[in-house]
């Protein structure tokens, strides 16, 4: 439930789809497990997991959704060994070289044979549609996984006019200014971790962890032309995170004190607790993202 990463996208047009319409659109693209011959399957699943009953969970016009992906695990080395063995057998029996086209066909046959016996793994990715921010927040550290989710959502809705979040001023410039100044603007507070990178290929990368970032050793790297591309920060007393120069947010962690705000709800009704946690997280993410946009903005104008 609690998001751990943020890959952010903003709408080019207001998102006006209501919960019922969104639910119906996703219903045509629900997840189903791999059959014996499927390499992978991908689709929408219950937003609140096994406790939930809907593909979309909405509160205060914020929409939570989830995609599930199942992939068969076929190690490349296993396929290669089987292919090499089969090719060697044919070449010995028929006294000729096997062509590339034949190898491709044999490889497909081997894959088809092995698929029913292959193990599979499942992963889930959540996204939060937030019309009040005109944004979609994807809980993933991988841009590829985020784009997969958006592609399926676009297919379900027919269109999805979103672009990756970016700012007019490079984030690394802003982070570097903060480190040089020795502080981040409220409500943010710098922590003890940063990554500095040179614009030139020869300049290299320097990482600092559990270190006072205002020390001369750190500032000396900035003096030689390096810029801050990752910086650990706190947002008030509620969120710790790692801000990255590509506008993605990693290692998002809500504090125990903040999460305890729903302790009075209890855990006797798991669905009620999930709903309360979703409302609490959603409200804080609105404040958080607004503060991030204000600190790093203005937004880069879309073409």
Curated annotation (Swiss-Prot):
Domain of life, source organism: Bacteria
UniProt keyword Transcription regulation, yes or no: no
Cited Pfam families: RdgC
Assigned protein family: Belongs to the RdgC family.
Protein name in the entry: Recombination-associated protein RdgC
One GO term describing the cellular component: cytoplasm
An annotated GO BP: DNA recombination
Cited PANTHER family: RECOMBINATION-ASSOCIATED PROTEIN RDGC
Alphabetical keyword list: Cytoplasm, DNA recombination
GO MF annotations, alphabetized: double-stranded DNA binding
Keyword Transferase appears in the UniProt entry: no
Function, in words: May be involved in recombination.
Location(s), subcellular: Cytoplasm, Nucleoid
Natural source organism: Shewanella frigidimarina (strain NCIMB 400)
């Amino acid at each position: 439930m609690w998001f751990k990463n943020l890959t952010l996208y903003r709408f080019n047009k207001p998102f006006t789809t209501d919960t019922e319409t969104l639910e119906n659109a996703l219903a045509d693209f629900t997840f189903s497990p791999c059959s014996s011959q499927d390499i992978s399957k991908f689709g929408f699943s219950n937003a609140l997991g096994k406790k939930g009953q809907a593909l979309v969970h909405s509160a205060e016009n914020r929409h939570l959704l989830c995609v599930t992906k199942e992939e068969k695990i076929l190690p490349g080395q296993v396929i290669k060994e089987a292919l090499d063995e089969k090719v060697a057998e044919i070449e010995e029996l028929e006294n000729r070289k096997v062509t590339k086209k034949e190898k491709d066909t044999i490889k497909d046959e081997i894959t088809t044979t092995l698929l029913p016996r292959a193990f599979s793994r499942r992963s889930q990715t959540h996204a939060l549609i937030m019309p009040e921010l005109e944004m979609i927040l994807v809980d993933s550290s991988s841009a590829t996984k985020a784009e997969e989710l958006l592609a399926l959502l676009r297919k379900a809705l027919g269109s999805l006019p979103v672009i990756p979040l970016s700012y007019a001023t490079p984030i690394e410039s802003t982070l570097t200014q903060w480190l040089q100044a020795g502080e981040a603007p409220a409500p943010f507070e710098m922590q003890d971790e940063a990554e500095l990178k040179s614009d030139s290929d020869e300049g290299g990368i320097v990482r600092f962890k559990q270190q006072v970032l205002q020390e001369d050793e750190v500032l000396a790297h900035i003096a030689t032309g390096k810029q801050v591309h990752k910086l650990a920060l706190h947002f008030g007393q509620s969120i710790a995170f790692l801000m990255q120069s590509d506008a993605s947010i990693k290692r998002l962690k809500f504090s125990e004190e903040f999460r305890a705000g729903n302790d009075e709800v209890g855990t006797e009704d798991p669905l009620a607790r999930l709903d309360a946690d979703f409302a609490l997280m959603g409200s804080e993410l609105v404040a958080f993202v607004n503060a991030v946009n204000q600190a790093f903005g203005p937004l880069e104008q879309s073409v």
